[in-house]
């Protein structure tokens, strides 16, 4: 008997037919003699609808109250799925995140898991029940409901798999696995049989929406192999693991874009020690994640510093910097996007960057900023060119 954790996203449970489809997948897994824990997201566009409802009341809702509101979406999903499973003769019980034992820090709307108390889940499994858990949510030390941020249900599933030492952790989506690019927008994409944690982490953080990057971080930390599958088409998916069989096979595993990007530029920064610390220390105090950083050559004792962050955090970043006595000349560009290629094979092969830049040049796409690591190359470009850039780069590297 194996212990299997299965996670289903919002599109997989968006209506009655999809819920019963998921229930049959879960019931078949359980009837095969396995213990099953299911983690479910809110149905369809429920989270966006709840955010819109809050906007009808106030333009500045408190983070605590937003968590109280958003957590209701998953509670609807888990109860309906548990009902469907019981209707199929498969004994099931639904648990909220806090009933399942998720304890978090106090960072409302983007909380991090501090611990998972598994006694309740284990006790229900011992009673031969399928345990249906609300993803994305937990409880902090103040006994307040918290949410884990977008994609938090993936993180919930991996945390359960790690804590229970599950034999498998399956992430069901509306696509059949991890592809070299978004198959809905790019032609001739390839589905990957395997991908490493590091490669998947880069793709997830760069905008590939198959897996949440925090879930991949957690899977890598606890070596939880993930299997990305379609809830609509029962075909083999993609396995995410530490080491893949084709480590020296495909040079590039994927091309991704991220349109949630803002470029903030600070002009005339004193060219002296400690200024970068002051800038990024202020941003760190507000939990603003910075990605690419570009510093100009100093002149007349001054320099310019540009960096990228999520567009949703740009307003706070601008306010924090302008409120400082040191930085008054600050501007923001929200018309940018980031396109990236990822692959462990780049570590030992030359010429990959030139092909990427050639593809952009051939399509008259200007590069504003460049960032590289051992397995990633990213370029900041105009947002209007993002889709064209991904297709051009994919054609250059995979055709």
Labelled PLM ranges:
Residues 1-216, 308, 381-382:
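Nucleotide/pyrophosphate-binding catalytic subdomain
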Residues 34, 90, 224, 288, ...:
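Short phosphate-binding/catalytic loops that engage adenosine nucleotides
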Residues 168-172, 226-228, 291:
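Short hydrophobic alpha-helical runs that function as membrane-insertion/retention elements
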Residues 211, 222, 233-238, 314:
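Surface-exposed amphipathic alpha-helical tracts and adjacent flexible/coil segments at the periphery
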Residues 219:
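Acidic-aromatic/histidine active-site loop/patch
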Residues 224-235, 259:
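Active-site C-terminal subdomain of aminotransferase-like
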Residues 236-399:
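A conserved regulatory-domain signal marking ACT and ACT-like small-molecule sensing domains
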């Amino acid at each position: 008997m194996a212990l299997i954790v299965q996670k289903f996203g919002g599109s997989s449970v968006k209506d009655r037919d999809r819920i019963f489809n998921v229930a049959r997948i879960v019931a078949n897994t359980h009837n095969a003699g396995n213990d099953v824990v299911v983690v479910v997201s809110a149905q369809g566009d429920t989270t966006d609808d709840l955010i819109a409802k809050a906007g009808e009341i106030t333009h500045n809702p408190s983070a605590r109250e937003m968590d109280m509101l958003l957590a209701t979406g998953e509670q609807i999903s888990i109860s309906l799925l548990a009902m469907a499973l019981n209707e199929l003769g498969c004994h099931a019980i639904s648990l909220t995140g806090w009933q399942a034992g998720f304890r978090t820090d106090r960072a409302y709307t983007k909380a991090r898991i501090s611990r998972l108390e598994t006694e309740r889940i284990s006790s229900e499994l011992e009673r031969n029940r399928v345990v249906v858990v609300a993803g994305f949510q937990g409880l902090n030390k103040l006994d307040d409901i918290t949410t884990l941020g977008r994609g938090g249900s993936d993180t919930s599933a991996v945390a359960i798999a790690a804590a229970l030492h599950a034999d498998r952790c399956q992430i069901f989506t509306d696509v059949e696995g991890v592809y070299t690019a978004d198959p809905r927008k790019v032609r001739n994409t390839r589905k990957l049989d395997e991908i490493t944690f590091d490669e998947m982490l880069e793709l997830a953080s760069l905008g590939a929406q198959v897996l949440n990057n925090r879930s991949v971080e957690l899977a890598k930390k606890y070596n939880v192999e993930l299997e990305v599958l379609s809830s609509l088409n029962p075909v083999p998916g993609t396995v995410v693991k530490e080491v893949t069989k084709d480590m020296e096979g495909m040079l590039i595993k994927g091309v991704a874009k991220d349109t949630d990007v803002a470029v903030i530029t600070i002009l005339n920064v004193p060219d002296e020690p400690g200024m970068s610390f002051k800038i990024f220390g202020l941003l760190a105090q507000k939990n603003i994640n910075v990605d690419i950083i570009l510093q100009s050559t100093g002149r007349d004792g001054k320099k310019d510093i540009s960096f990228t962050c999520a567009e949703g955090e740009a307003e706070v970043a601008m306010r924090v910097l302008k409120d400082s006595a040191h930085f008054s000349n600050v501007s923001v560009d929200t018309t940018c996007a980031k396109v990236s290629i990822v692959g462990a094979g780049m570590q030992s092969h030359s010429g990959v960057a030139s092909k990427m830049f050639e593809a952009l040049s051939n399509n008259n796409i200007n590069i504003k900023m460049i960032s590289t690591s051992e397995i990633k190359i990213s370029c900041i470009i105009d947002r209007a060119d993002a889709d064209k850039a991904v297709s051009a780069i994919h054609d250059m590297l995979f055709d």
